[in-house]
From Swiss-Prot:
Catalytic residues as annotated in Swiss-Prot or TrEMBL: 10
HAMAP family registered for this protein in UniProt: HslV
Pfam families assigned: Proteasome (PF00227)
UniProt organism field: Rickettsia bellii (strain OSU 85-389)
Keyword annotations of the record: Allosteric enzyme, Cytoplasm, Hydrolase, Metal-binding, Protease, Sodium, Threonine protease
NCBIfam families: ATP_dep_HslV (TIGR03692), PRK05456.1 (NF003964)
Listed name of the protein: ATP-dependent protease subunit HslV
Regulation: Allosterically activated by HslU binding.
EC number of the protein: 3.4.25.2
Assembly description: A double ring-shaped homohexamer of HslV is capped on each side by a ring-shaped HslU homohexamer. The assembly of the HslU/HslV complex is dependent on binding of ATP.
Cross-referenced CDD domains: protease_HslV
GO CC, any one term: proteasome core complex
Record-stated family: Belongs to the peptidase T1B family. HslV subfamily.
Function: Protease subunit of a proteasome-like degradation complex believed to be a general protein degrading machinery.
């Protein structure tokens, strides 16, 4: 049983199309090759739904990071980019935090960011970001669907992409939830 699979078994996708920003997550919690729960909620809204965050990795670690992010967002008056950079600095340098094994996607009206325990804050190209074991499947599907002019909304693209990821990744499922940045 690989600990790496236990820590990263999920799919989180965030995309922006026509000023609409959606973040989606599957509901599966796995430990190794065992499904512990199929209806987990891996997304959180912050600052009255103006900021949304999703995590992949250890559940306890992800929740701890949400709490730290909320504090940073309040400290920096809802400035997501500055809050993310400050969280990443703490995450990398603090003895306790640097042991946390999770990744996050956070988004507001202006930014989609990937945060890692290595201290990385990455703003992805093409207005699409994904993390977790099914992340590359969801990312590929979303980029393909967004690469040509189509009538699909951001939410429809996210749901189709997440379903493709759930079909391919055994650590992700079809219990998909979405949140929209307002």
């Amino acid at each position: 049983m690989s600990d790496n699979l236990a820590l990263h078994g999920t799919t989180i996708l965030c995309l922006k199309k026509n000023e609409e920003i959606i973040i989606a997550a599957d509901g599966q919690v796995s430990h190794g090759n065992t499904v512990l729960k199929s209806t987990a909620r891996k997304l959180r809204t912050i600052a009255n739904n103006k900021i949304i965050a999703g995590f992949a990795g250890s559940t306890a670690d992800g929740l701890a990071l949400f709490e730290k992010l909320e504090v940073k967002i309040e400290q920096h008056k809802h400035n997501l980019l500055r809050s993310a950079v400050e969280l990443a600095k703490d995450w990398r340098s603090d003895k306790y935090l640097r042991r946390l094994e999770a990744m996050m996607i956070v988004a507001d009206r202006n930014h989609i960011l990937i945060l890692t325990g290595n201290g990385d804050v990455v703003e992805p190209e093409n207005n699409v970001a994904a993390i977790g074991s099914g992340g590359l499947f969801a990312l590929s599907a979303a980029r393909a669907l967004m690469s040509y002019d189509n009538p699909l909304t951001a939410e429809e693209i996210a749901l189709k992409s997440m379903n493709i990821a759930a079909d391919l990744c055994v650590f992700s499922n079809h219990n998909i939830i979405t949140e929209k940045v307002v």
